[in-house]
Structures are given as C-alpha cells and as structure tokens.
C-alpha cells in the first residue's frame, strides 16, 4: 500500500544548482509541430511539484489552488513553498526575465523559448546543446550510429519524390529543432490516406521546417521509456523504465510501470546517456526504445528532458509496487463533480495525485479542470477496474 512517510529516491533539486529555476511550460509562441492549447500548457507547469523538493518551479496560478492543497493533504504532502506563479503570457515572460536579469537565476527550460523572451546566456543548460540533443535528425550522433531503424533525412521540397521509394508502414518526423511531445508531430502512415494527411500537415509547417525524417515503422513487441539522471556529484543514475501506452498512430495514452526490463535495453539507454553527458548534458532524460521480435533495440526518440512518467519512477517508494499507470484526465464540464470524484479515489488510496489545473480559477465551469495522477494497486486488473469505475462516475453528473 501507499507509504506516505517515504521520500522520493532522488529529487530534482539533487540535480541542479541552487540558482536554477525550472519551467516545464512550452513557450506561448506557437510551433507547427507542438500545438497544445494554452490550458494544457499551463497544466504542465504543475507536473513536477512532488519531485521538485527544493528546486523552485514556475507554476500557473490555476495549478496551485486550494484544490491541489486538498489532494496533497490526503497523501500527507504539501505544495512546495519554492514556487513562482504567473497567470498569463505577459506575467510568465516578465517573471522569467525578472528571475534572470534581477535575481541572477538560471532557467532550466523543458522546452526552449525564443531569444526575444530570454537570451541563451541565462539558460541553466546550454541552449545550443539542448536543441542539438533533442533534434530527431541528429539521433545517430547520440547513439553512435547504433539502434537505428532504416531512416533518411530529406529536404522538405524533396519529400514527395523521396516518399515514393518507401513502403508502408512508415513514420515521418520533423527533422529540425522544433520540439514535439506526446506523439504530436510524429506521423505514422499505414496507407495512402494517412500519407495524404501527413502531406497536408507538412505543407502547413513548410515556413518553419526545412527537413523531414522518413523512417521504417518498427513492429515492436515492447515500447520502453528508459530514464536516467545525471549530475556531477551523483554521476549517471538509472531511474527505471516505463512502458509507453500509445495508439497505432503513436499518440500518447500514458505509461505503466514495468519490471524485468531487458539488460541490453538498459545498456543501450546508458550508452546514449553517456554520449549526452559527454557533450555537457545534466538533468533527467528519457529515451523511447523499441524492441522487435528478434530482440533488436531501436531508438525512435531521445528526450533529453523530463518525461511524463518521470514522477512515477521517482515516487516508486510511495506507490503500490504491483501495478502503476501514469495518466491525466479532463473534466467533462462540471468541475465540482470532477474534483469530488478524484478526491474520493485519492482517499480510497488507489489514485495518487500529481497535479490539478483548477478550471474554476477562471470562474465556475468557465474552463475544464485537468488532473495528472498515478493509478496504483495490487494488479493491473484491479487498477483498470478502478479506472473504469472512475470514468463511469465522471460521466454521471
């Protein structure tokens, strides 16, 4: 069962200097491959509060209301004191500038921001390096040319000619520095109708994208997010791995805990992490590694940044070790019913809260609330039964 007294194995403040402030919010400035709406981006700011420890985090005011305090209280936790809050684009960008220019802070960005918002000299992790490590076209550099499916990087104007030489199923990804997340920006094509949809998206992004990656679609038997952390004092630490839950088109449906990760998969991840560290990386990274029927490992995405399931791995001591599932939910419209249903399951001990974006901060039911959490229980069957009951209750209001 839940052990409320346990502390995380490792916290984010173990990895960063005292002058670092963390923001997980994507920039307000749009990007054709990453288009979460404003509320989703604000919701992301509360995701790491339980693993931050002393690391100051920039959080939207709606992600730190009394609702979150109530949920944390049930599990014996408190909202950290070391948070900086904002409430709109102007206050967010002003806060970042003030922290850097007036308070001599370095900002650790989950997603890079434009130079007009903050000059790269104020980044905790070198911006050029961060961009390079997360550029999908440069994956072969960080894997030493190993763990790669058949792939080709092409100029966007050559794409429609080149794609004629490929067979389905295939994957198309942006080959530039713009970030993607949760499968958005990754286009899996099983047939010509999928390809035509992808071509439409590519045309919309032509102004900001120079190149694309075409990749053989791996028929995987397992899809792991293998995670590591590094600081100079700690060295490289293996945090664990989570199984990625995605639909057939690669869209993210959460993570579940996994045991008995094959050693050669962990070792592949460690080699990639070592390459990043040798370039100057520090912090948390998670690598999407597929295993096919022949036990070959393929690196399909390298996230040299925190991942959605990082909290699940770092909070393992707090959770039932049987089965865990990380996911998030949106209110159906009645935010009070949404919150009360969540509170019920948190009190029952089957639902572990991570973040709560309070839509009522904007006015009653003006915006749909959102909730990030970990389900945990003795078995997968028990957890999924609880989740089904929870979803059914959310529908009845």
Curated annotation (Swiss-Prot):
One of its GO terms (molecular function) is protein homodimerization activity. The active site is at 305 (critical for catalysis). Pathway: Amino-acid metabolism. Changing residue 307 to A: 10% relative activity. Changing residue 255 to A: Loss of activity. It catalyses: L-aspartate + L-methionine + ATP = L-aspartyl-L-methionine + ADP + phosphate + H(+). Residues 131-347 form the ATP-grasp domain. GO terms for biological process: alpha-amino acid metabolic process; methionine metabolic process; sulfur amino acid metabolic process. Changing residue 44 to H: 13% relative activity. Optimum pH is 7.5-8.5. This is L-aspartate--L-methionine ligase.
